[in-house]
Amino acid sequence: MIKLIATDVDGTLVEDGTCRINPEYFTVIQQLRELGIQVAAASGRQADSLLSLFEPVRDKMFFISNNGGVIGTSSRILFVANMDETLLQKLLEDCKAFPDCYLLLSAAEESYYLEGCPEDFVHLITEEYRFGAEPVKDWKSLPPIVKAAIYHDPALPHPARVLIEPWRGRLTGVVSGREWVDFIGPGVSKGRALREIMESLEVSAEEIMVFGDQMNDLPMMEQAKHSFTVGGAREEVKAAAAHVTAPMQEDGVLQVLKNLVKNKGEFT
């Protein structure tokens, strides 16, 4: 019997950068909880964006935010992995070489962007993602930072390789959706965060389902026997997944979850 479901959000349940979700997900999450199945949303987003997205069922879920940097529920934070301050400052210096990219730094409960960022970027993070983000004059005197997210125009060449390679072994750099490259502490990932939840609930790999579509979902998918990706996901993710559902636009994950409810939590 399945005891825990963990799912990515952007590109898996919703269009990247939006909070428009099929309300049937709320119904099926409620039904899963009635069957005793726990549900976790795992995302590069910060916690308040996830809480807003899942508002009707927020009190019934776990939330893995900031690509594994924070684990919590609607009422409390369970785990935080802050970045090393010295490494963070060096990363911020390196990012100055990319004038077409914009930074969003996330603490456990708040995010920050520089004053003067383009209005489109500010609208994206505050209105589309619904991040609780504050403008700051500089990066000084901020609370401990969990994640540095680098946004780039999806119409431009993806800077992931150039950004990530120099930091390999010192920070974890991951592609998070079409427009973001995220940096978190070494060893931090959705997979590590999911493992923390699995151990606390005493859930095995055979008792969990995981859904994802991007490279940052692979560590999480490795924790589960029943790993799924959606049609339209990256080919590397399809190759790693045990199953491929219908595309996100066709609510492929919802179809799987409905069948699981129909079968009383048994996956066949």
Segments from the language model and where they lie:
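Asp-based phosphoryl-transfer active-site loop
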Residues: 3-18
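Active-site phosphate-binding/coordination module
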Residues: 23-121
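Mg2+-dependent phosphoryl-transfer enzymes with acidic/Ser/Thr/Gly-rich catalytic loops
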Residues: 1-4, 22, 182-268
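Short, structured coil segments at secondary-structure junctions
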Residues: 56-59, 67, 166-169, 223-224, ...
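Short, acidic loop-to-helix structural element flanking the phosphoryl-transfer center
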Residues: 18-37, 80-87, 129-132, 188-199, ...
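Short active-site oxyanion
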Residues: 36-40, 59-61, 146-147, 206-207, ...
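Conserved acidic, metal-coordinating active-site core of Asp-based
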Residues: 94, 99-211, 215-223
